[in-house]
């Protein structure tokens, strides 16, 4: 199965979700993301930021990571975390990255996700990577 690349803030919500998947993963550092390079296909798991207006939905560290052409060339899909209290901007980082990188938006989950979210994502990633022929 392919690699998961993720960013998690100090809240560790995204980290806890990814850890529960039990899959191979690499974390985008909070600083120095421009020096963080991935050389294989990956699915990005990212939290959504913003106070409901949609601005700043993608964390700056993730933007820096994806601004590297090599990193961007290996992204195959995106999964986003969010907070449904923000209505239309729930999981907006996934929409933004999917559109800009032209990759599928595979799933969104709230905060740290539920056991059902973990099972769905794990099963979905198995199918996704099989279709990608990795």
From Swiss-Prot:
Alphabetized InterPro entries for the sequence: Flavoprotein-like_sf, RNR_Ib_NrdI_bac, RNR_NrdI
Gene3D superfamilies: 3.40.50.360
Biological function: Probably involved in ribonucleotide reductase function.
Family: Belongs to the NrdI family.
Name of encoding gene: nrdI
PANTHER family: PROTEIN NRDI
Protein name per its UniProtKB record: Protein NrdI
Swiss-Prot/TrEMBL GO biological process terms: protein modification process
GO molecular function: FMN binding
Alphabetized Pfam families for the sequence: Flavodoxin_NdrI
